[in-house]
């Protein structure tokens, strides 16, 4: 039986994202195969990675909370997409970079610091009308992100010139300081203050981007909203985040969807819920009524003798299942019976006759006794 992901990370089920991230960092540091050579450490590390992969994303976490491991089988973004973590190297860099011989401060890491860097992911919150969420469709959005400067092709240098290798760090992006103590020598590694860790110095900056290599650009995008989305659904638009640095790929744009409330309809999973009001005579005798659905007006049969709060079902008139729009939920209508507070004399006379036939007593205040018994 699979272990509980919250138990694996050692956090409560109501832990917030930061608590989950901190727990993951602590355990990843302890069980990473490059650090922990004990038997079983690698499997434990994979287990920790999978738990974080599910619990760090609101969408997969919600599915896991509701359905357990079966609800997220095959789910997850993959560790390579966890941009907010910066990768395994960044986690361990913060732990080991201050010490020589830590295994994380060698030439490979120096090249990585000055090499291509992926752009940041961006988030956009988008509101949808109720029917837009039900049926999906195309939506135009406006975003502002960093794009590679066309003038300097992202180098940050004026056309015709090139950045030079930083003389302070020799292009590594890092400077080292050796401290000698009675316990031995320690090497502290920090970001080069001259080039800010890039390993390159721009002497003649590009006028178009002021040496940054990127420009802030506002643009319009058309995105496809799948049928059946709900509050909190996340769409990933690849390579529409901020531009990368030094030739690195751009990040992604994550669009979080939020659905406006509807005056008539509510939603419960893939079912649509609404109410319909009928007169007490329609409830007693039965009738045919036209009711509104997300697909438009539909005829509904109210059977004779329908009781208050009876739920009528219109099959396949609900919300399409996300990822499988052929499958739809139902439309559930709660019947509310409108009992009048006042009746005309002719109507009262007829009702009193009916009450006598049924043997019901009527009070001074009207026909509560009769109508109350009628719907028992």
UniProtKB/Swiss-Prot annotation:
What stretch or stretches form a coiled coil here?
none
Protein's GO biological process: chaperone cofactor-dependent protein refolding; DNA replication; protein refolding; response to heat
What organism does the UniProt record list as the source?
Trichormus variabilis (strain ATCC 29413 / PCC 7937)
Q: Does the keyword Glycoprotein apply?
A: no
Q: What is known of its domains?
A: The J domain is necessary and sufficient to stimulate DnaK ATPase activity. Zinc center 1 plays an important role in the autonomous, DnaK-independent chaperone activity of DnaJ. Zinc center 2 is essential for interaction with DnaK and for DnaJ activity.
Subunit info? Answer: Homodimer.
Q: Which InterPro entries match?
A: DnaJ, DnaJ_C, DnaJ_domain, HSP40/DnaJ_pept-bd, HSP_DnaJ_Cys-rich_dom, HSP_DnaJ_Cys-rich_dom_sf, J_dom_sf
* GO molecular function annotations of the record: ATP binding; heat shock protein binding; unfolded protein binding; zinc ion binding
Q: Where are the CXXCXGXG motif repeats?
A: 149-156, 166-173, 192-199, 206-213
Which UniProt key words apply to this protein? Chaperone, Cytoplasm, DNA replication, Metal-binding, Repeat, Stress response, Zinc, Zinc-finger
> Where found?
Cytoplasm
What highest taxon heads this organism's lineage? Bacteria
Instruction: State the CDD domains in the record.
Output: DnaJ (cd06257), DnaJ_C (cd10747), DnaJ_zf (cd10719)
GO CC field: cytoplasm
Tell me which PROSITE patterns the record gives: DNAJ_2, ZF_CR
Function, please? Participates actively in the response to hyperosmotic and heat shock by preventing the aggregation of stress-denatured proteins and by disaggregating proteins, also in an autonomous, DnaK-independent fashion. Unfolded proteins bind initially to DnaJ; upon interaction with the DnaJ-bound protein, DnaK hydrolyzes its bound ATP, resulting in the formation of a stable complex. GrpE releases ADP from DnaK; ATP binding to DnaK triggers the release of the substrate protein, thus completing the reaction cycle.
- Annotated Zn(2+) 1 binding lies at 149, 152, 206, 209
Q: Which SMART domains match?
A: DnaJ
Q: What is this protein called?
A: Chaperone protein DnaJ
Cofactor names: Zn(2+)
Protein family: Belongs to the DnaJ family.
Binding residue positions for Zn(2+) 2: 166, 169, 192, 195
Cofactor binding annotation: Binds 2 Zn(2+) ions per monomer.
Q: Where are the zinc fingers (CR-type)?
A: 136-218
Identify the stretch(es) annotated as Disordered: 102-121
Residues forming the J domain are 4-68
């Amino acid at each position: 039986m699979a272990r509980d992901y919250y138990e694996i990370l050692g956090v409560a089920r109501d832990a917030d994202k930061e608590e989950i991230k901190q727990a993951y960092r602590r355990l990843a540091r302890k069980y990473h195969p490059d650090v922990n050579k004990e038997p079983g450490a690698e499997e434990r590390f994979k287990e920790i990675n999978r738990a974080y992969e599910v619990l760090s994303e609101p969408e997969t976490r919600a599915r896991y909370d509701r359905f357990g491991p079966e609800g997220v089988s095959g789910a997850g973004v993959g560790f390579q997409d966890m941009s907010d973590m910066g990768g395994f190297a960044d986690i361990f860099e913060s732990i080991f970079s201050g010490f020589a011989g830590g295994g994380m401060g060698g030439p490979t890491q120096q090249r990585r610091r000055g090499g291509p860097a992926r752009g940041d992911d961006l988030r956009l919150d988008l509101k949808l009308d109720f029917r837009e969420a039900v049926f999906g469709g195309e939506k135009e959005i406006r975003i502002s992100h960093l794009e590679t400067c066309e003038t300097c092709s992202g180098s940050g240098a004026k056309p015709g010139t090139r950045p030079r290798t930083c003389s302070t760090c020799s292009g590594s992006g890092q400077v080292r300081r050796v401290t000698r103590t009675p316990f031995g020598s320690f090497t502290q590694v920090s970001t080069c203050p001259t080039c800010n860790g890039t390993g390159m110095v721009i002497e003649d900056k590009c006028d178009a981007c002021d040496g940054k290599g990127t420009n802030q650009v506002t643009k319009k995008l058309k995105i496809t909203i799948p049928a059946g989305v709900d509050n909190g659904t996340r769409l990933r638009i690849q390579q529409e985040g901020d531009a990368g640095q030094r030739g690195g790929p751009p990040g992604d744009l994550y669009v979080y969807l939020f659905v406006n409330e509807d005056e008539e309809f509510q939603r419960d999973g893939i079912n649509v819920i609404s109410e319909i009001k009928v007169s007490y005579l329609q409830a007693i005798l039965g009738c045919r009524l036209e009711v509104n659905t997300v697909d438009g007006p539909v005829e509904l049969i109210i059977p004779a003798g329908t009781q208050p709060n009876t739920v009528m079902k219109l099959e396949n008139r609900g919300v399409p299942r996300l990822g499988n729009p052929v499958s739809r939920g139902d439309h559930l209508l709660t019947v509310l019976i409108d009992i009048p507070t006042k009746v005309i004399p002719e109507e009262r006379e007829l009702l009193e006759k009916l009450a006598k036939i049924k043997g019901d007593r009527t009070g001074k205040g009207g026909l509560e006794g009769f109508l109350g018994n009628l719907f028992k």
